């Protein structure tokens, strides 16, 4: 009887772990589906050209977050002629393939004036896939100040996406500063747009 109970308990734990993983992948797939369906630039049949890496939990990190106090505003380079005012709000730290990675978190001065976006933060980054498998001017991951809990930020690169400049001209998209150009490969999130002219 004890042996049967142990077997049933093991099966239950295994099925629970499987369902949790399945639930994670399902939620990410829902995120990607919604991203494609509601895309602000790519329309109609062109949406078939949006590509993504297979969902991989390896690229989901509980990062240590360090707030940078009294960080000065600076003009961040963009893909166009207009520079945009940002500041380093903080830094995140995580380890990938035995490499400690540091990325700066930025806050837009313009978006702080918009009530719905005043807590918006983002991480623009380039990595070892940039220009090969992913857009040559980098990708973004964004979130809210409220997502930072006890100096921990969940960064899921499966949600990394391309700026609008990857699809069409006419936008001034922030270009990742040199501090956010890393040598490891983030093989997660959105890939290079097939119809990109850049």
Which sequence ranges carry the predicted segments?
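Terminal leader/tail segments of proteins
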Residues: 46, 57-59, 71-78, 90-92, ...
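Short loop/turn segments at secondary-structure transitions that flank enzyme active sites
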Residues: 67, 109, 129, 161-163, ...
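Mid-length scaffold segments of soluble, non-membrane domains
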Residues: 78-137
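Start-of-domain marker
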Residues: 20-73, 83
């Amino acid at each position: 009887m004890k042996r049967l109970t142990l077997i049933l308990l093991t099966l239950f734990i295994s099925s629970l772990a499987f369902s949790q993983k399945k639930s994670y992948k399902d939620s990410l797939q829902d995120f990607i589906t919604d991203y494609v369906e509601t895309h602000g630039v790519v329309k109609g049949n062109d949406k078939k050209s949006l590509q993504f890496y297979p969902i991989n939990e390896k690229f989901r990190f509980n990062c240590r977050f360090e707030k940078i106090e009294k960080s000065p505003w600076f003009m961040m380079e963009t893909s166009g002629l207009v520079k945009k005012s940002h500041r380093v709000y903080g830094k995140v730290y995580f380890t990938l393939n035995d490499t400690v990675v540091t990325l700066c978190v930025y806050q837009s001065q313009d978006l702080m004036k918009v009530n719905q976006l005043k807590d918006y933060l983002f991480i623009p980054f380039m990595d070892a896939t940039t220009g090969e498998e992913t857009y040559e001017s980098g990708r973004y991951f964004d979130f809210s100040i409220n997502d930072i809990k006890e100096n921990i930020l969940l960064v899921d690169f499966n949600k990394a996406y391309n700026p609008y400049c990857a699809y069409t001209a006419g936008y001034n998209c922030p270009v990742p500063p040199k501090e956010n150009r890393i040598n490891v490969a983030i093989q997660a999130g959105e890939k290079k747009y097939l119809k990109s002219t850049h």
